Amino acid sequence: MEWRDEGALLSVRRHGESSAIIEVFTAAHGRHAGVVRGGASRKIAPILQPGAQLDLTWKARLDEHMGAFTVEPLRSRTALLGDRLGLAGLNAICAMLHVTLPEREPHSTLWQESMVLLDALDRPGWPPAYLRWEMRLLEETGFGLDLTRCAVTGSREDLAFVSPKTGRAVSSGAAGGWADRLFPLPLALLGQGPASAEEVRQGLAITGHFLGRELAPLLNGRPLPEARARLMELLARA
């Protein structure tokens, strides 16, 4: 078995004396793990940094085997090492892809959007794009939010809240006495105008709630990844 693909490195761990096991998110083969022979060597180890864009060739005797990668660097994202917020964003993306995606299942649209987001992390103003990316993650888990109309009245006007149970929008008038039990709906989630820092934080509280709920069987009682919590902490200070 053999294939060639492009992917971003999600994680790396040492394997034996000189090799490494990497996990990558690829364009056509999804989240995939494999051994890199000599991955702990001085020559290859510097290439294997989270977020690095790689040209990958995977080989295995049988498809169900872990197999081995040969890697060639396409793009390094080590510039983010000097940017605390950008690095936190990169780590959150890698961690969320790891816990969200089944192994070896292609998600081509998410892959394209993830690469665009990773490329944006060294420029200011990327947090709203991260919020939109988490919305896409929810869709990939099969639970996209429905913010097009009020769940109670069907109206498209005056949408002000999100139900924490259904993920559907609720208008201000329909919320009534339940308003304090609902999430405020930031305009950023509706794609209306530029997103303020507060709207991004509100939006991520919503996506975090539903991602945590939908991923609960995979997390086995654990919270969402610490890398995401670290990003939320830094955004709260911004």
From Swiss-Prot:
Family membership: Belongs to the RecO family.
Annotated protein name in UniProt: DNA repair protein RecO
Recorded GO CC terms: bacterial nucleoid
HAMAP family: RecO
Swiss-Prot/TrEMBL keywords: DNA damage, DNA recombination, DNA repair
Stated role: Involved in DNA repair and RecF pathway recombination.
GO biological process, one term: double-strand break repair
InterPro entries linked to this entry: ARFGAP/RecO, DNA_rep/recomb_RecO_N, NA-bd_OB-fold, RecO, RecO_C
Record Pfam families: RecO_C, RecO_N
